[in-house]
């Protein structure tokens, strides 16, 4: 199993880079794969998990079948096949207990995520919200994030079908991740999301 990624640190240097620069970087990566292996992988991993709608369109145009971000969660039938979640299984997060737990999780399916673009240019205007497809999961739902750099629980405002982060929620610049879970009938459900605040 071989997956491709970008050729350089263009994402790291300029997370809000224009799509043409990113496309050129991916094409360089594909060229190198062809030179070294004789084929171009049809799986892709977004560097640092960052992907706007425009970048996802590039991935589709390059005939990449599926791609992964760096947001945690199980895959569902509603997942964007060109921006799927995953769990890291490595030396820091790879013990058998974590693997067993991660593989047993059910997807917490959400709709109408706002803002829809993960790239946030003004955190003062950020009001993060989403709708939960299975309303039975709202009561037990809790969210955690590193929105200020440290992992903490997030105050939520819930109604019958949607969840809104409290107005008191604070955000700092950088790559920020959000994980929401809910336990129902003895099973855990998980939704992960990533944003990049400039």
What is each of the regions a protein language model found here?
Residues 10-16, 26, 72-73, 93-96, ...:
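Extended hydrophobic/Leu-rich segments
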Residues 6, 28, 54:
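Short Gly/charged-rich anion-binding patches and loops
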Residues 1-7, 11:
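Single conserved hydrophobic/aromatic residue that forms the stacking wall/gate
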Residues 12, 32-42, 50-95, 105:
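His/Asp/Glu-enriched short active-site or ligand-binding loop at hydrolase and phosphoryl-transfer sites
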Residues 9-37:
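Alpha-helical scaffold elements lining the catalytic groove of polysaccharide deacetylases
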């Amino acid at each position: 199993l071989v997956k491709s990624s970008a050729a350089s640190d263009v994402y790291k240097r300029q997370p809000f880079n224009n799509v043409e620069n990113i496309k050129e970087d991916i094409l360089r990566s594909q060229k190198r794969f062809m030179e070294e292996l004789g084929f171009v992988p049809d799986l892709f991993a977004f560097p640092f998990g960052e992907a706007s709608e425009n970048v996802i369109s590039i991935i589709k145009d390059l005939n990449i079948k599926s791609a992964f971000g760096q947001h945690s969660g199980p895959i569902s039938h509603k997942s964007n096949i060109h921006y799927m979640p995953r769990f890291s299984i490595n030396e820091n997060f790879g013990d058998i207990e974590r693997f067993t737990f991660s593989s047993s999780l059910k997807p917490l399916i959400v709709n109408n995520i706002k803002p829809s673009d993960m790239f946030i240019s003004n955190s003062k205007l950020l009001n993060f919200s989403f709708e939960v497809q299975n309303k039975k999961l709202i009561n037990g739902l809790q969210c955690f994030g590193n929105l200020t750099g440290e992992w903490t629980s997030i105050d939520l405002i819930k109604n019958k079908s949607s969840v809104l982060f409290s107005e008191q929620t604070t955000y700092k610049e950088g790559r920020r991740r959000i994980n929401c879970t809910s336990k129902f009938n003895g099973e855990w459900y998980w939704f992960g999301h990533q944003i990049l605040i400039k």
